[in-house]
Amino acid sequence: MRAQKDVWDVIVNNDDICFTHILPRLNQTDLKFLYDVNSETRKLVKRSSRKGELKKRFKVSEMSSISTLELAWDKKSLWPSDWEDETYFCWEVAKTNKLELLKWAREEKQCKWDEGTINAAAEQGNLEMIKYCVANECPIDEDACACAALSGQLEILKYLREEVKAPWGSDTAAWAAQDGHLHILEYLVERKYDQYDTWACWEAAKCGHLDCLKYLHETAKAPWNYRAVRGAHENKHPECVQYLLDKNCPLPDGWRYEHGELHTI
């Protein structure tokens, strides 16, 4: 009991220690829970540099226990206005990356879900959660593969495509290119992926991923258009711009490439 009192004293009566070693470890949601403990913690948080965060909403994706999720579930009146139904709650629970919390939402609360749940699991590379979603017939669409590609989760993408037979579309290549995941693009070629559109080269160019841009053009034979040049130029990726010019990529209307110089309007 004495030890608990000493810890409590450190938290509420030693700002130097608390502000340096305790509050920085709390996410925004934890901070709001601390604030609500009692009058002492409310004063503490208001004294800190993080008091402005109290105005922000709880984030279900930051919650780490069933007890905190229970509170969020019971306070539906405080859910964001853009949550059209409870499937958004399940989606956010999946973002916690904790399967036991998703199981609680589904099995204890009978929370409805949609494809957003498995998309969140795919982006985080949580194979165990994805297998749970598949086993329990969570809706799935082509965004699951795209989300795995976006975060470079090759094993997840392989599982979704080869085991689950999940569909994929042009976003899979484009989102892989956006974050420079060359290994994902190589896998797509290996699997004879044929959903390329000009978005993939545009993403690679505007984000400065020259290796991906080269691979898309030379190996994957992905199409491109003037947006690739514009994107690379506007985002200051001269190596990508030069590669596009050397390969005769179409230019935006009014732009010219003459005598080794690019003229824009």
Give the role of each language-model region.
Residues 1-265:
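Ankyrin repeat (ANK) tandem alpha-helical domains that serve as protein-protein interaction scaffolds
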